Curated annotation (Swiss-Prot):
Name used for this protein in its record: Large ribosomal subunit protein bL20
Function: Binds directly to 23S ribosomal RNA and is necessary for the in vitro assembly process of the 50S ribosomal subunit. It is not involved in the protein synthesizing functions of that subunit.
Gene (name only): rplT
Family per similarity comment: Belongs to the bacterial ribosomal protein bL20 family.
Keyword rRNA-binding applies: yes
Organism this protein belongs to: Prochlorococcus marinus (strain SARG / CCMP1375 / SS120)
Length: 115
């Protein structure tokens, strides 16, 4: 059986992990074993939090819309239900932006929906 030398491949694999771990504190950024563990955990967290970010922003938009709607005498659920009945297609992100940046137009939207 012939001998297999993996020096180049192994070094590249380790250096790839160490490049990903650049900036980590202490041995987590310089020793391969600990860096590998930290990088794996960081990638898992990044994957999880990319999914979580979508949920978090939706919750934030709903909270903002609810606060603005209640200032105009309507609950969030009634506002969204009436928007659907009136066939007004504004998504929650846009509604939250309107509520914060342009309260007068948000009042008009609520007034249109109340009819």
């Amino acid at each position: 059986m012939s001998r297999v030398k993996r020096g180049n491949v192994a070094r590249k694999r380790r250096n790839k992990i160490l490049r990903l771990a650049k900036g980590f504190q202490g041995s987590n950024g310089s020793l391969f074993r600990t860096a590998n563990q930290r990088v794996m955990k960081a990638l898992c967290n990044a994957y999880r939090d990319r999914k979580r970010r979508k949920r978090d922003f939706r919750r934030l938009w709903i909270a903002r819309i609810n606060a603005a709607a209640r200032m105009n005498g309507m609950s969030y659920s009634k506002l969204i239900g009436n928007l659907k009945k009136a066939d007004i297609r504004i998504n929650r992100k846009m509604l939250a932006q309107i509520a914060i940046l342009d309260p007068t137009n948000f009042q008009k939207v609520v007034a249109d929906v109340k009819k």
